[in-house]
Structures are given as structure tokens and as C-alpha cells.
């Protein structure tokens, strides 16, 4: 999933094992999660029993909500979703969303309500018009909002980031409110809850934040709000702590799998980032029923990391081509094609895919066939990039993205997530749609590729790497690397607009399909914005501690 592979001499003997790379720092976590000990069964049972009582109490509150009290209803739904509780109330929330969308009888002069309603509906797949904000524009080009009405200002800023191309009113809302919020932040107490909200939004608008991480960060802020619902607050804390127990057990399982993979395959040159990869994938599939998706995703990401490091830095051209030939056979008899150092890994990879089939059972094991197809396509594209490299070919930006938007692993990741979902709405048609690499997933792949390349290119330019999208853009337009990176950041911003437009146009697919792609985009943005946190993972340490180490005090 990094940039196309560096050139390696083809004269190395097949039996030579690549040496460990000094480029990548060792794991920051060691055996930490391998030694995890869960609470006793009675303790966990008590937590689950209390959570169930609270869930039903909150359900009654939600069922009692109507559009007659629109501000309260909108705020309640936003709060539940932001606290990571929306999954439990999908039916009730869907019913209310339809009523909110259909009911135009509300105070259109209330900027906070208009902003929150717009944000809520667009976030949940309703294509509401942005012209509701036109009445708030001033002759000076700003937006009418009293200086003391800071909450409305923040709501408008966050709502505007659910924008589509050509929505000038939202462009103007972002530029206008950003300046006012930056000024406001300088006058707030730094540790106040509202200052933290403003600061977080200026760094990452609410729509783009990783859901489970946002829940962890928002719970202590919600606790300070005078209008908080005590049952909602207690449930949010308990729910997060229960999820954390599941996450730690999954991390223990994935860490053991990874350690066995590296020990038996003897591939010591690969990046040891299984904890960070689990954190990354967790951000896309954090709801309680998606445990198997998280495990499959993490293992697939681990396998891709190994294959990528083989192709990217350590394998000869001949070795990589042999691996590609064996890969598509999915059979132990193909190991005779491989150099010695790849053979054990190949067998372990086959065993891993068999474990996926076993975990899915007879009714859903067919999903692994689609996952294999996605992985075959990934390796096929890796070989195309090798040919470009060996021929010293620099593609145009458009030509590069036709390959690299897919070779970044977009299809492999989405198919991995869908494979592990218990939801029976995920069908063969869902996988066939995904494997056709439709424009929505292609846009997501371009987003991941560009985000990766902007942060990895400067690090990789000192090595013998094939041109990234940054280099392609530099050559095509005759500009510097810094200027190319700035332009690509604009393209990344456009990708958010593209994905929103394309998601709103999707028909006939389970709603989890676009939701998953957006969650992948959020967690990828968190990994690559301003740094390559997978390679230099110190940047993730505090976030990993928050999600997997530190429970929320009850």
C-alpha cells in the first residue's frame, strides 16, 4: 500500500533471505497486548446487564421524540451517533430522520438548528439543498451570527464540510467561520470543553473524524454539558468500556497471529505494525457486531504490508513475478515456483485464508472467493508497477491513478470488511459491485493513494523508488515538489466532495456500504494527514492508549 516498488538487483540468489530494514523503527508495543487479561466473567456479565437496562431506557427517550420538538430531537440523534451509540437505535433513528427530512415546518431563522439539521441529514444520506443557508448571508459576504452565538458558528462550520462541488454558499461558510473560530479560540480558556471542540473542529471537521475515537474524546465533554442525559452518559461510558474489552481480545488474537507469521516465515524485514494496523482498521469497523470484519481486515492489512514490502524494497523483479504467478493458484503445490524465503509465507497465507472460511461457516464462506479475487487483482497491479519501474516510465497523473488508486488496496479492504459482516444484506451482488471498482470506490482509492503519497514521497525520494503521484504531477506540470504536494492536497479535498456526491447517488445497496467507505476515508485521513503514521507510528501512541489501554472512569 506504499508507493510503487524500488528497483532491486535481479542477481540475488533465490535462497538469500532479505535482511531487516533499518528504515522502519521497531514496534512500540512489543508483547503488550499479548499479555492482556480480560475481566472475570461475572464482572463482564454485570457490565452487559447494566448496559442493556440503560439501552432500553434511552430507547424510550428516543421513541418519545418527535419533530414537534425538532431542536431537541436533532440534538439527541446527533449526540447518540457522536457517542458511538447510534448502532443500537438504527430503526428508531431512521424513522425520525425520514420525519425530519419530510417536515419543513421549522424555524429557518435559527442558524444552529438549520446547521444541525443539514449536517444530520446529509451525514445520513439525505440530499438536502444547501440554499437553506443563503438567508443568513450578509452584504459583506459573511454570515449573520451574533458574536455571543458561538455554538451556531461552530455548527455552521461543521455542516459546511458536507459540501458538494459548486456549492459556493458552503465554500463561503467555511472561509468565513474558520476566521471567526480562530479568533474566538484565542479568547477561550484553553482547557474549557468548548475550546477543545473548536480546536478539534479547526483541525478536523466533525464529519471527518474517526467515529470510535470521537466517541472516546466526546464522552468527557458531554459529561460537562448542563443539558446532558444521565442515562445516555452512563450508557456511553459503559458501552465504550465494553467495546474496549472486545478490542483488546481481538488485538491479542491478531498480535499472536502476526508473531507466528513473522517467526515461521522468517521475514524479519517487514514493518512490525500489527497494533497500528488494527487501530487503522478498527476506525472503519468499530461497531459491536463487526468483530470478524476487524480481524479479517487487520490480517489482510498485515499480509498486504508483507507483500508490499517484498515488492517495494526487498524482492528482486524475478522473485516478485514468481510470487505473482504462485499467488493466483491458491495451492501449496505452487511453492516450487517461489524462492526459499517466500515459501513459508505463502503457506501461512493460505492457512490464513482457510481460517477466514472456517470462521464464516458454510453459508458465508463464499465471500472469501471474492476477497481472493480482490487480492489477486492487487498483486497483478503490483507487477504492472514493477514494469513501469524497470522501464523508468513516468506515467501521467491520470494514467498513474488508473493503476495506483486500485493498487493502494481499496478493493481488498472493502471486500475484507464486507466479508466479515454478519449482516445478511451483504450479498454476492454487493461483492460483484465492489469488484467492478465503481467510481465511488475508485474515488476512495484515489483519496487513499494521494493521502499516502503526499506524506511518503519526501521520505522515499532518498531511495530508489519509482515515481509517485507527486513525481508524476511535478513532471507533467513542471513544478516543484512542494507546489505539487499543495496541488494534490487540493485534489484530496475535492475527493471528499466527490465521495459525498457519489454516495448520495447510490441506489439499491445496503446503507452500510457507503458508510463503510466514509469510515475508511476518515481513518485513513487520520493515518496520513500531516504524517505517515503507519511508518512513523509514534504519532498514534496516545490515540492507541485512549482506545485500547485506558478505560473511561465510570
From Swiss-Prot:
Mg(2+) 1 binds at residues 308, 312. Transmembrane segments: none annotated. One of its GO terms (biological process) is diterpenoid biosynthetic process. Changing residue 391 to Q: No effect on the absence of activity. GO terms for cellular component: cytoplasm. Monomer. This is Inactive sesquithujene synthase. It comes from Zea mays.
